[in-house]
Amino acid sequence: MKIILLNILFISAMFAQSGLTVVGGLNQSKQTIEEDADDLDINYMNGYNLYVERSFGVARFGVGLNQRGVKLNQEVSDMGVTVSVAGEQTLNYLTLHAVYPYAIQEKITVFGGIQLGNGINGEAKIKQSISGSGLFDGTSVDSEEWDAEDMELEYGLFLGGDYMINEKIGVRASYFKGLSDIFEGVTTKNNTISVSLLFNI
């Protein structure tokens, strides 16, 4: 993590001192699962975003960190036995984006473009509970970790808008619609809603 942060600081230093925007805030992420997902509850997972941006010509380019994920719940009952499974998946990405901004009012700007994500690492925690069986009743917790080699290059649409409180400080709401699968052989895509503060240097 320290190396990643140093890389971001280095890239930030490469940007001109004027015109740099620092953005940071909260993510609410979930996933689109194209496989059979009957009886599977797919819920939002909290995360964070932290990145820097700068304008080059008519476009804005940014680099930073995004944490995505999902919460999954499933319960199956048969012959008096109930099996409940609750899972949390967290995925960390180094992201790059390019957007085209359009000012619709003096303080309001909307934008659209693309975002790429290179996987850093991830983790899944799964809690399984069995009840009604008697002998096999109980709860177990398992976890699994992934590194960058396990994760596919992510890409998708990046849309949003900025509201400037003053010349330096503003609020951003954005949406990432993943168009690529998160792992090889898995038809699952990330979707993220973000609310962030931005600061113009």
Regions found by a protein language model. Give the residues of each.
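Transmembrane beta-barrel domains of outer membrane proteins
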Residues: 51-55, 99-102, 160-164, 172, ...
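Flexible, solvent-exposed loop segments that connect beta-strands
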Residues: 31-42, 69-92, 120-151, 182-186
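Outer-membrane beta-barrel "beta-signal"
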Residues: 19, 162-169, 189-201
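Repeated loop/turn-to-beta-strand initiation elements of outer-membrane beta-barrel proteins
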Residues: 20, 57-61, 107-110, 167-173
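Residues that define the transmembrane beta-barrel architecture of outer-membrane proteins
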Residues: 18, 42-48, 55-57, 90-94, ...
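Transmembrane beta-strands of outer-membrane beta-barrel pores
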Residues: 26-30, 56-58, 65-69, 116-120, ...
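Sec-dependent N-terminal signal peptides
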Residues: 3-13
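Start-of-domain marker
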Residues: 18-68
